[in-house]
Amino acid sequence: MNLDKLDENRVEMALTKLAETNELHAALGGQVNYLAEGIKQAKAHSFLLSEGGVSEREQKAIASQKYADALDAHLQAYVQFKKIDNERQHEQRIIDIWRTLSSNRRQGSI
């Protein structure tokens, strides 16, 4: 990024982006946590429905379609969450750089 073009308008855009994505970020974070619990429940459910020894039942639970579906749902939610999280972190870095540059300008360092 060209730091000469980092002005108040760009910082305002960053703040707007952060404000507009607050709820989505929180919702996706909650969904990721919820689906992580769903993975455990799917595995436990498949384990309880299986027959055999503990090790065999564990392997059957991990190989079950219900467990695979839960993993897939979690992965999809996690990818969406990380995408918005990374975008928000980028905007936060823009704001942090702006603060540093502004401070340096006030002190006469730049």
Question: What are the language-model segments listed below?
Answer:
Residues G29-V32, A36-E37, D72-R105:
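Long amphipathic alpha-helical coiled-coil segments
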Residues E51-Q80:
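Short, glycine/alanine-rich amphipathic alpha-helical segment
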Residues E12-L15, S64, I97-R106:
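Short A/G/S/P-biased low-complexity tracts
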